[in-house]
Amino acid sequence: LCELLECEPYLSGNVGSGSVEELAKWVEYITAEGGTLAELRAKNGRKEPWSLKYLGVGNESWGCGGNMRPEYYSDLYRRYATYCRNYDGSVLYKVASGASDYDYNWTKVLMNNIDLDQMDGISLHYYTVKGWDGSKGSATDFDTEWWYNMISKAVEVEEVIENHKAIMDAYDPKK
């Protein structure tokens, strides 16, 4: 699909229930020129390796990705990031599972506990859903009150981004 759309893939690795070995093998399967996993990829219909530029090390680790504390996730991130590399020689940008909305402490802990040479980015999760009670609402069938609620929350995203950026800049002003 990414080749058809001419865009870069983003692979999100499972650190909640998957192993370091499993994620490292997925990256090898995708990017290796030769070896057992490249042979398996060819057997599955794809002889040439894919290009992989972005690797998300976990996703929503503060919630459904493991309900982790940022300190614990930071330790896992360092472990997983150590063993994941591209087999085609290109740079693999490793992206940490970032905070949800206004959880600035999550960003501070990650920036403080993960070596900057191991982390190339942090994802941000920000949602403009109706509620977290399991009923996120319809994408097309909503009333005026719901619409205004979503738009007002969307307007706040710039402030959230700027606040997380300020924290990251304090630890790494050159990026």
PLM segments and residue spans:
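Alpha-helical scaffolding within the catalytic cores
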Residues: 1, 33-47, 78, 102-114
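Active-site-proximal beta-strand/loop segments in catalytic clefts of secreted hydrolases
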Residues: 12-16, 57-60, 97-100, 124-127
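Carboxylate/His-rich catalytic cores and anion/metal-binding grooves
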Residues: 13-34, 116-121
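Active-site groove signature of glycoside hydrolases
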Residues: 36-69, 125-136, 175
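Noncatalytic carbohydrate-binding groove/subsite architecture in carbohydrate-active enzymes
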Residues: 70-175
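Extracellular/periplasmic catalytic domains that process cell-envelope and extracellular macromolecules
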Residues: 3-4, 46-51, 55, 89, ...
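Active-site-adjacent substrate/metal-binding segments within catalytic domains
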Residues: 1-14
